[in-house]
């Protein structure tokens, strides 16, 4: 009888260990899945996570009839900053900008780092172009706020291209290409230069302090795709 009792206790202990192992295995898999969708430097979505989020947002947009906006963001002159201050300070800048963007987002929005100095933000359920313009302007102001790198005050410029689903493309690749193209056009604009491009309907200017602490007018630029 005692042997039977011991065997029963051992079996119970084994069952508990198996259950604990399965729980830990499930948690480990969830952790791996989560990390596989995240940028290691900033903790925001990476390209893989970005694609999944944008495709889901576009599906909801088509199903429920609301607009989804894609903001494609490039940090201007980041290579020069990286060269002048070093990769460590470059990483600090990227993390700082990432956090600033996160702080300006709504709970329904998502952000991804696409690599290097490029970010993407998905804005769901946007009611109007004017609303997108307001959000984008706030993003530019936040990015251009001075930050300290190696005890020097540095401000950066950014260019943002905007595309809106469904009118600018119903597929992932089309929408991203429209937003990226609009960003590249914005990047070419100089201060006070008139706009005359297929995508452009708006330009936002942001005054900022340049990286050498002398007064200068730098520009954050936005194109909204209208194709």
Language-model segments: what does each one mean?
Residues 1-26:
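N-terminal membrane insertion elements
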Residues 6, 111, 138, 142, ...:
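Cyclic nucleotide signaling catalytic output domains
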Residues 8-10, 125-127, 167:
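Hydrophobic/aromatic docking surface of two-component receiver
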Residues 19-33, 186-190:
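The C-terminal output helix
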Residues 28-45, 59:
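Amphipathic HAMP/coiled-coil signal-transducing linker helices
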Residues 46-69, 76-106, 112-116, 120-121, ...:
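Conserved long alpha-helical elements within nucleotide-processing catalytic cores of c-di-GMP signaling
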Residues 122-124, 163:
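Short hydrophobic/aromatic beta-strand micro-patches
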Residues 212-226:
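C-terminal capping/lid region of NAD(P)-dependent oxidoreductase domains
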């Amino acid at each position: 009888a005692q042997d039977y009792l011991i065997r029963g206790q051992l079996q119970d202990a084994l069952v508990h260990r198996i259950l604990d192992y399965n729980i830990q295995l499930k948690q480990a898999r969830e952790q791996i899945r989560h990390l596989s969708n995240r940028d290691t430097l900033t903790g925001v979505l990476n390209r893989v996570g970005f694609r999944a989020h944008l495709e889901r947002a576009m599906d909801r947009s088509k199903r429920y009839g609301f607009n989804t906006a894609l903001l494609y963001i490039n940090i201007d002159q980041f290579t020069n900053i990286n060269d002048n201050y070093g990769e460590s300070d470059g990483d600090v800048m990227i993390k700082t900008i990432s956090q600033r963007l996160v702080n300006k987002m709504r709970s329904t929005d998502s952000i991804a780092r696409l690599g290097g100095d490029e970010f993407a933000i998905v804005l769901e359920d946007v009611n109007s172009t004017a609303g997108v313009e307001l959000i984008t302007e706030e993003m530019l102001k936040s990015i251009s706020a001075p930050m300290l790198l190696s005890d020097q005050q540095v401000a950066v410029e950014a260019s943002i291209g905007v595309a809106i689903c469904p009118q600018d493309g119903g597929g992932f690749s089309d929408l991203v290409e429209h937003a990226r193209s609009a960003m590249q056009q914005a990047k070419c604009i100089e201060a006070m230069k008139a706009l005359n491009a297929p995508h452009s309907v708006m330009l936002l200017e942001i005054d900022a302090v340049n990286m050498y602490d002398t007064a200068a007018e730098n520009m954050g630029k936005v194109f909204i795709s209208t194709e």
